[in-house]
Each structure stands twice: as structure tokens, then as C-alpha cells.
């Protein structure tokens, strides 16, 4: 298995092997927290209008997002902390600036994974078992390319998968961003 790091969102859109979308600070960590809380139904959307339309037909979903919604539209912040307080029985909908857009940008991939430092070792163990190539996608490619955390994490994950590097050192680098 080869492990590559995406440099452009166009690379993601045509990749057909495995993709890992990395969003260190928000969406991946929020989604991981929702799943850890026991949620069995977590859906992602690429834009607010589609999320609003879905929620109107499915009012049982709790929306997690940092984006602007129509006035009066109830939603939680795209926050791992808010997700940690979530009711496990309520389905969730997540729409974000970069992470969920990156997931939709990866539609051609055979398998799509999401993560960051929150599930680094579990993700690495899973990826080591794959035979097909892996493209690591910093979600910042789909929004603010200045988000250094995503790039630090994909570099650390690539190094770790190739048998060198130390995730804890990368976490310390993130603390300095």
C-alpha cells in the first residue's frame, strides 16, 4: 500500500482507492465523539441548504454545524464538547466548512474514512490492513488552506504508517499553531 498526501481538492475528486479525510479541530472530532456517545445514525451534508431540507423532513435529527442557518433554525455548534453531551438515541446531521465538503469531494473513492488525532491509532491500525493505496486529505484543502493542524496530522499519519514518526510530537506541533 502506498500512502500519499493530497495537495489539491481536484486530486480527491478523481481518487478511486482509499481516502482518509482529516479534520483535526472540528468535524472529524465531532463525528468521532457522536459515534463514541453511541449514535447509530450520523449523516453528513455538504451544504446548509441540503441539511435544512433534510431536517425539515426529518425533525428527529440534531444538527451540528458552525455555519450560518436561517433565523430560528435550531442547531448545535460543530463542537466535540457539544457532541459529548449528545443523547445517543437521537440521530445526528453534520454540515461544516471543510470536513463534510471534503467527504463529498471524495465520492469516487472505494472507501472513505475520517479522522484526526482523536482516532489516530485506531485509524492507523485499520489503514495498515488495507491493500489498496491511501490518499490522506487535509480537509483544509476544501476551505481555509491556512489550517496547519490538518496538514500536520496527515504528515504524522503518513510517517506513522510508513514506520517512522511520532504522533505525540505532531500533537505538540499543533499546540504551537
Residue locations for each model-derived region?
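Short acidic, Gly/Ser-rich segments with clustered Asp/Glu that frequently serve as metal-coordination loops
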Residues: 9-12, 19-33
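Short beta-strand segments
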Residues: 21-22, 64-66, 94-96, 115, ...
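Conserved active-site and cofactor/substrate-binding residues in soluble primary-metabolism enzymes
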Residues: 22-29, 46-49, 97, 118, ...
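Glycine-rich loop at the start of a catalytic domain that most often binds anionic cofactors/ligands
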Residues: 34-39, 55-61, 74-80
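Long, charged alpha-helical interface segments
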Residues: 58, 75-111, 125, 148-177
